[in-house]
Amino acid sequence: MNFLAHLHLAHLADSSLPGNLMADFVRGNPQGDYPAEIIDGIYMHRRIDVMTDNLAEVKEAREWFRPQTRRVAPITLDVMWDHFLSQHWAQLSPDLPLDEFVRYAEQQIVPILPDSPPRFVNLNQYLWSERWLERYQEMDFIQRVLNGMASRRPRLDALRDSWQDLDTHYDQLEGQFWRFYPQMMRLAENKQL
């Protein structure tokens, strides 16, 4: 899962949106560094990552990547799940339009930025102003995201080429998303994540 899915599941679970979004920027044990609700959100994010990586649908989707891009498939898929969530937001969350949810999330997260890791603060400078969460609907933006990650981390250069795998298997990936994401939503609503 990437930013949008983590925020969505956190919202459904009444968990900390800042903690869930910040988790990838916090290493090790966060105890003592953040308020309890942020820590709970960090741990929820980590549980979701482990659960998602071990889902049969996600493991199968990884196998659809070519050998030269399979190593980065987990990262590429995380971004792609956000694409499908953004694409189908109105169906999955009919009572809360995506633009309203994004405004709500921003209002929850921006106030905690002064006490946040610098890399997380940097992310937030772009996430909201460039409307990333809404733009995940656009496959051109997904390609830009993958290229940006590859540019910042040379060992992830294969992310550039993983775009081709997404294009080749788009319909199958969308099917996989529908097989697992509604279940994740139910788990979140039942506080089981």
UniProtKB/Swiss-Prot annotation:
Q: Does the keyword Ligase apply?
A: no
The protein's matches in InterPro entries, at most eight in alphabetical order, are given as: ACP_PD (IPR007431), ACP_phosphodiesterase_gpbac (IPR023491)
Catalytically driven reaction(s):
holo-[ACP] + H2O = apo-[ACP] + (R)-4'-phosphopantetheine + H(+)
Q: Which GO terms describe its biological process?
A: fatty acid biosynthetic process
> What is the main EC category here?
hydrolase
Q: What EC number(s) has UniProt assigned to this enzyme?
A: 3.1.4.14
For this UniProt record, the keywords arranged alphabetically read as follows: Fatty acid biosynthesis, Fatty acid metabolism, Hydrolase, Lipid biosynthesis, Lipid metabolism
Q: Which GO terms describe its molecular function?
A: [acyl-carrier-protein] phosphodiesterase activity
Question: Which Pfam families is this protein grouped with?
Answer: ACP_PD (PF04336)
Regarding protein family, the annotation reads: Belongs to the AcpH family.
Q: What does this protein do?
A: Converts holo-ACP to apo-ACP by hydrolytic cleavage of the phosphopantetheine prosthetic group from ACP.
Could you tell me which PANTHER family the record lists for this protein?
A: ACYL CARRIER PROTEIN PHOSPHODIESTERASE
Q: Under what name is this protein listed?
A: Acyl carrier protein phosphodiesterase
What species does this protein belong to? Klebsiella pneumoniae (strain 342)
Taxonomy, top ranks, is: Bacteria, Pseudomonadati, Pseudomonadota, Gammaproteobacteria, Enterobacterales
